[in-house]
């Protein structure tokens, strides 16, 4: 059986985490060109620290990442670095965002983190399906203008 570990000089390690973080005020800003740029920035910053991105998905108002962080970094140390440096890079490229966010803080203060063990495949699948789940949730919030039982158009106010 092949072990799924990485190694340093005298250390074998497997430190995988599911991390979720969001823009300040949970604004739906991560789409289009800015989504591509944020993805490139995060990949570059992870590469600098030797952090492997196993799976990632950027939704409009949050980012999911499954990462392997070397044991020489704590999760909080890495997240402080990632969110701090990426904020500076985002505001450097999109200076107009300073007025929306103020104080050069693009991300919310906190984040969600969970360790990953035997459930790695399930978490990868969950992250891959995040965009579809967000889209489905958005569709459910749209008003129905067709009666689901008869298929006939519905006058406004009938369902309210």
Where are these regions (language model features)?
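Basic nucleic-acid-binding interfaces
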Residues: 1-160
């Amino acid at each position: 059986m092949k072990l799924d570990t990485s190694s340093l000089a005298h250390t074998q390690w497997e430190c995988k985490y599911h991390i979720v973080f969001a823009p300040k005020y949970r604004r739906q800003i991560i789409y289009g060109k800015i989504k591509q740029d944020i993805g490139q920035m995060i990949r570059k910053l992870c590469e600098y620290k030797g952090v492997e991105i196993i799976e990632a998905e950027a939704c409009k108002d949050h980012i999911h990442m499954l990462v392997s962080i070397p044991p020489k970094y704590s999760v909080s140390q890495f997240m402080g670095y990632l969110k701090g440096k990426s904020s500076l890079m985002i505001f450097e490229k999109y200076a107009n965002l300073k007025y929306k966010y103020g104080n050069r803080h693009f991300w919310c203060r906190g984040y969600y983190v969970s360790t990953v063990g035997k459930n790695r495949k399930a978490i990868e699948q969950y992250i891959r399906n995040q965009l579809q789940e967000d889209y489905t949730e958005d569709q459910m919030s749209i008003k129905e203008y067709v009666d689901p039982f008869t298929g006939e158009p519905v006058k406004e106010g009938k369902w309210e």
